[in-house]
Regions:
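Metal-dependent peptidase/peptidase-like ectodomains
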Residues: 119, 232-296, 344, 398-537, ...
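A conserved hydrophobic secondary-structure block that centers on an alpha-helix together
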Residues: 158-230, 234, 343, 356, ...
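Alpha-helical metal-binding/catalytic segments enriched in His/Glu/Asp
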Residues: 214, 334, 349-403, 408, ...
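C-terminal amphipathic alpha-helical interaction region
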Residues: 658-760
Length: 760
């Protein structure tokens, strides 16, 4: 999962007082989805829950879980799973471990050598630090590598490609530089690491090296470890480079990786890279980059190393060798249920427990908070509280290699989840600072309401208001500030595929949230041996007060979701978000039409030739066909229907609550809840996205060339990115039909609720 960049926020006392006034709730206003009577009782249980969360317990959970390396297939990975299972059982959950068998390669041989014009061998190892005892667990640590890199042994000239995205290769084209037959070196950042070898291979490169530049997470940002919290000169970011065609086990797409599952051969697995890849430290990168010549890299390509950044190719000539043990390994998902009075509806909560090494931040900070939530839910249950809906806590294994545990579990239980799942709430890393949340916007009003009830440990204002004010301070322009101020809700970001929410949102069509705190910690050791208890307790959430805030936030959300009379959804923010996605498509089309028209004019005028510096020659950009008209009317019309249906449901819910939420039979409420649970499934199309059929959701999906980053309405957007305008246009009516189906589902729920209110 990606980590927070450091941001700073100053909050004036006047802003604080105004914020407090704005966020005060009217006592008589019931919670979303609750009757007035149920709302008051609910808030009492929620306050008991929040009061019972103990930071010292979260600290102890982290100390235990991160004590040793616990990657997939390691002894401590299984030991942690069994310990987590024992805790859930101790707290009164009905708990079990579900085991899957997945492909998980580990390194056998790794070589990066500079052969010409000088000789150098990369260390490819993070050193033991005397001040950090955990770093000495070398026998149990995974070496520095990129999982799912194909085996390979290649020697070639080196080319620097910045972050290695498609736009970077377009820039190389302008410089007249080809990577065909070369080994590329890219710096981490600006998207999923697996995109770097993918694009390099498509451009003809035969190998890929990825390094951590100090401008991204090293001494450029602050003192490096152990004096400060930032990545040291020999620190390396491990990570998967699996392609984005589908997440999960590469050999069992679309089915759970059980013992009986039919498996692809490794040769036929589409998500394994086409060229060999290795990560290196910035110390190992300096000798390689220093021996490049050719054009000086553009300004925005230059990192924080004390060298002149050249692009190449050569004269640096590099030997890259990768060989792995391609073995099947067991993964252990811990699934724990607190049964509700209605076992037919499920609220799910998850965080992964595996790590690349010790993983105090990623993922143990989130997992430790999850366990404290579960402990306190068990305590409430002993005091007499029983949730209406069943609550399922999930400690996933195998997230780091490619969301293996959550994907295989969802694929195995897909039919049950589609029938019973109300929502899924995810966490991963948790740090110090501001509330961050993403997800499906039908839960935007809900999570905003929850966040108003949680106190920020540094300011004592609500975490909702502190995050909102921070967003205003760091808004990119006046328009963004205006947009933030015009909304009473916390604006959810759109999720791609950075963590275990992916299968729930993109494959199963389940309403989803992912929640974290961050932005104020003093450094990062992302996927390094130094991401351990010693580092975390010095430089991140020292007193675990933000671990408590995370547990309070998500635990409150879980209780509120589980107890609501009606599933607490509000579709208006979702309709607004989808309208924004559609407007972005129209803007992209208009911008491309303008860009290509202007480019063709400048080519015709000879402007590029006239502006070319003969001492630093560049190649003119290619002639592009100006995009034709695209008919967005079907989608715009469908979105109008969606807005009207969302408004209708909001009015029906308000009327139900205004009438005192008359007592009705459980069966009638359950019928409406069944309607509501079905709505997010209507975003799915069984055929999936055009080039990636595993991804079923037609609104929410990661980009094929972004990974972590979302590409809303991907069926249209990605054809536009490929300049396949006719194909993009053909997708619009199909997406419009999906949106109309969603509107129809919301209208059904609204009509049933209107009927219920009229009856009483």
């Amino acid at each position: 999962m990606s980590f927070w960049g450091v941001v700073f926020c100053a909050i004036l006392s006047g802003q604080f007082l105004a914020a407090q006034a704005k966020e005060e709730k009217t006592p008589s206003t019931p919670l979303l989805g609750y009757s007035s009577q149920a709302s008051e009782k609910e808030q009492g249980w929620e306050q008991k829950f929040r009061d019972g969360i103990v930071p010292a317990n979260i600290r102890e959970n982290m100390r235990r879980l991160s004590a040793r390396p616990h990657h997939v297939g390691s002894p401590y990975d299984k030991d942690n799973a069994e310990w987590i299972l024992s805790k859930f059982k101790e707290w009164g959950f009905d708990a079990r471990i579900e085991t899957f068998n997945v492909l998980f390669p580990t390194p056998k041989e790794r070589v990066v050598e500079l052969l010409e014009p000088t000789k150098f061998s990369a260390k490819l190892q993070e050193p033991v630090l005397p001040s950090d005892a955990t770093s000495s667990q070398t026998a149990q640590q995974l070496p520095t590598y990129n999982a799912y890199s194909i085996d390979g042994d290649v020697t070639a000239p080196l080319v620097y490609v910045n972050h290695g995205n498609r736009e970077d290769y377009d820039r190389l084209d302008r410089l007249g530089i080809s990577v065909k037959g070369a080994i590329v070196i890219a710096r981490y950042g600006e998207g999923w690491r697996g995109i770097k070898p993918k694009v390099a291979g498509e451009r003809g490169a035969i190998g890929c090296i990825i390094y951590s530049d100090p401008k991204g997470d090293g001494y450029y940002r602050g003192d490096d470890y152990p004096e400060g919290g930032w990545r040291p000169r020999l620190g390396v970011q491990r990570g998967s480079v699996m392609d984005t065609d589908y997440p999960g086990d590469p050999l069992t797409p679309g089915v759970g990786a059980t013992a009986e599952a039919k498996r692809l051969t490794i040769r036929d697995a589409k998500t394994i890279t086409k060229i060999p890849v290795l990560p290196i430290s910035y110390s190992d990168a300096v000798p390689l980059l220093s021996e490049l010549r050719g054009p000086v890299a553009p300004d925005e390509w230059r990192g924080g190393l004390p060298i002149t950044y050249h692009v190449g190719p050569g004269p640096a000539k590099v030997h890259l060798k990768v060989s792995s043990n391609w073995e099947m390994k067991p993964i252990y998902d811990v699934i724990a249920t607190l049964h509700g009075s209605d076992d037919n509806e499920w609220v799910l909560r998850g965080n992964h427990h595996d790590a690349w090494v010790n993983g105090a931040d990623d993922p143990v900070s989130g997992q430790s908070a999850l366990l404290e939530e579960a402990r306190m839910l068990g305590e409430l249950h002993r005091q007499g509280w029983q949730p209406k809906r069943s609550i399922i806590y999930c400690a996933w294994d195998g997230e780091e290699p490619g969301l293996l545990g959550s994907v295989e579990w969802v694929e195995t239980h897909l039919d049950e989840l589609k029938k019973h799942a109300v929502a899924y709430i995810n966490s991963d890393s948790n740090e110090r600072g501001f509330l961050g949340a993403g997800g499906t916007q039908d839960l935007q009003s809900f999570i905003s309401s929850v966040a108003r009830d949680i106190r920020d440990p540094e300011t004592n204002m609500s975490v909702f208001q502190r995050s909102r004010l921070n967003s205003i301070v760091h808004a990119k322009d006046a328009e963004e500030r205006k947009n933030i101020r015009s909304h009473n809700d916390f604006l959810l970001s759109t999720l791609g595929d950075g963590s275990d929410y992916t299968a729930f949102q993109d494959y199963a069509g389940i309403s989803t949230l992912s929640v974290e705190f961050g932005g104020e910690n003093d450094g990062t050791q992302y996927h390094s041996i130094y991401d351990d208890f010693y580092w975390y307790t010095r430089f991140v959430d020292t007193d675990f007060v933000y671990g408590r805030a995370l547990a309070q936030t998500i635990g409150t959300a879980i209780i509120r979701l589980a107890d609501a009379d009606l599933v607490p959804v509000d579709y208006s923010p979702q309709a607004e978000a989808i309208a924004k996605y559609e407007a972005e498509l129209e803007k992209i089309l208009k911008d491309k039409q303008d860009e290509f028209t202007e480019r063709d004019l400048e080519l015709h005028e000879g402007a590029f030739a006239a502006a070319n510096d003969p001492r630093r020659p560049t190649v003119p950009p290619p002639v592009e066909v100006v995009p034709p008209y695209m008919n967005f009317a079907p989608m715009k019309n469908a979105i109008e229907l969606l807005k009207k249906s969302a408004e209708r449901y909001s009015k029906a819910l308000a009327a139900w609550q205004r009438e005192g939420s008359p007592a009705v039979s459980v069966d009638k409420l359950q019928a409406i809840n069944t309607d509501l649970i079905a709505v997010p499934r209507l975003f799915l199309a069984e055929k999936g996205l055009p080039a990636r059929p595993w991804f079923k959701n037609q609104i929410y999906a990661p980009g094929a060339y972004t990974g972590y980053g979302a590409k809303p309405i991907a069926a249209v957007r990605e054809y536009m990115d490929e300049k396949k305008w006719k194909e993009a246009d053909a997708q619009i009516p199909q997406v419009a039909q999906v949106i109309e189906n969603v509107a129809g589902g919301i209208n059904k729920a609204a009509a049933d609720l209107e009927s219920l209110t009229r009856e009483h």
